[in-house]
Amino acid sequence: MLDPALLRHQPADLAERLRTSRGFELDVSALESLEADRKRIQVRTQELQSLRNSRSKAIGQAKAKGEDVSAIMAEVAAFADELKASEVALDELREKIDAISMGIPNLPADDVPAGADENDNVEQARWGTARQFDFKVLDHVELGARNGWLDGETAAKLSGSRFTVLRGPIARLHRALAQFMVDLHTGEHGYEETNVPLLVNADSLRGTSQLPKFEDDLFKTAVGDSTRYLIPTSEVPLTNIVRDEIVDAERLPLRMTAHSMCFRAEAGSGGRDVRGMIRQHQFEKVELVSISRPEDSDAEHQRMTRCAEVVLEKLGLPYRKVLLCTGDMGFSAVKTYDLEVWLPSQETYREISSCSNCGDFQARRMQARWRNPATGKPELAHTLNGSGVAVGRAMIAVMENYQNADGSITVPEALRPYMGGLETIG
């Protein structure tokens, strides 16, 4: 969440910045009314608490002298109900203000381009050259059907739409991709491999901002009195490792990676990408998370994005790097780079990685802090997350970019050690 001082002292300025950069309408009058009530009731609550404390002290002193305390106790009883009601009212007002705060998106960095949607994103660079085919290009669905690799029909019988059963060599290729990415990020990029729970509590999702705003896109389980959510990304458990922690400065930047299943309801997908594996309810991803000092987060963001780029380059997959505009960034982000891989069947680039610097937005929700050695005091850390990369989409890109005229797939050299030396499948 944003710094509460912005809401208290600069609500009109904040509202204008949110409107112009995020298209978000902040109800300033409602916020100012709640804040005025909070201040008034907080002052009265503090007065009553001070009075209670002073009278309690007086009771103790009177008892020590053997004096009658009935009059003082009657005085305390007279304002006890008001104090209790005042404390309850203050808590309710704070909850209402917090609810507003939790629904406000992060403010973009100054160098993020203004824009309404993906059409206003700014391309930063391209790598690789799209292959020119001398035969009819098939998409991943057609290639999967020809080889008996992708079975959506059986998956629909088992689970419904937006699921796929992978069979034989393509299942092995999918596994090889994940292993390759984890080995690369741990062996060459300095990330610590981390195995995380797939079920998390609501506090974890509030910490990384999926709750309360995006609850409709989450799968929720309930057993008895226990409610858990399937993770939409391992960003959630990885980042929450430092929730309510004070990290020693010498441990920063803290870099973690996890290969995990991810689960999304795709409530807002609007029927997009219903064919094939581009947009699934269940998919795998290798996630990168960094916890850094505030002054280092820009450089860490560039580094993280570069780590994701290296994955695509080692696989020989053409891609482009895009700086997202204000209207296309995620809720928590200060700044985001997307990597989009070339898909020959669509003759376009599709997102395969998104790398975001969230500043102190998530850290404030989580109370994730580091101890500044210059002051000896704890301060909010900065959190960053990125896909390094989406495994299913990488598999699709390999299938399409490395396809042959007979429907077989050439295995990229980087994956051959993970495929028992196989050079082609199919």
Curated annotation (Swiss-Prot):
One of its GO terms (cellular component) is cytoplasm. It is found in: Cytoplasm. One of its GO terms (molecular function) is ATP binding. The keyword Ligase applies. It holds the Pfam family Seryl_tRNA_N. It comes from the Bacteria. It is an enzyme of class 6 (ligase). Keywords: Aminoacyl-tRNA synthetase, ATP-binding, Cytoplasm, Ligase, Nucleotide-binding, Protein biosynthesis. Its EC number is 6.1.1.11. GO terms for biological process: selenocysteine biosynthetic process; seryl-tRNA aminoacylation. CDD domains: SerRS_core. It catalyses: tRNA(Ser) + L-serine + ATP = L-seryl-tRNA(Ser) + AMP + diphosphate + H(+); tRNA(Sec) + L-serine + ATP = L-seryl-tRNA(Sec) + AMP + diphosphate + H(+). Its main location: cytoplasm. L-serine binds at residues 233-235, 287, 387. ATP binds at residues 264-266, 351-354. Pathway: Aminoacyl-tRNA biosynthesis; selenocysteinyl-tRNA(Sec) biosynthesis; L-seryl-tRNA(Sec) from L-serine and tRNA(Sec): step 1/1. InterPro entries: aa-tRNA-synt_IIb, aa-tRNA-synth_II, aa-tRNA-synth_II/BPL/LPL, Ser-tRNA-ligase_type_1, Ser-tRNA-synth_1_N, SerRS_1_N_sf, SerRS_core, tRNA-bd_arm. Consists of two distinct domains, a catalytic core and a N-terminal extension that is involved in tRNA binding. Belongs to the class-II aminoacyl-tRNA synthetase family. Type-1 seryl-tRNA synthetase subfamily. Homodimer. The tRNA molecule binds across the dimer. Catalyzes the attachment of serine to tRNA(Ser). Is also able to aminoacylate tRNA(Sec) with serine, to form the misacylated tRNA L-seryl-tRNA(Sec), which will be further converted into selenocysteinyl-tRNA(Sec). This is Serine--tRNA ligase. It comes from Stenotrophomonas maltophilia (strain R551-3). The lineage of its organism: Bacteria, Pseudomonadati, Pseudomonadota, Gammaproteobacteria, Lysobacterales.
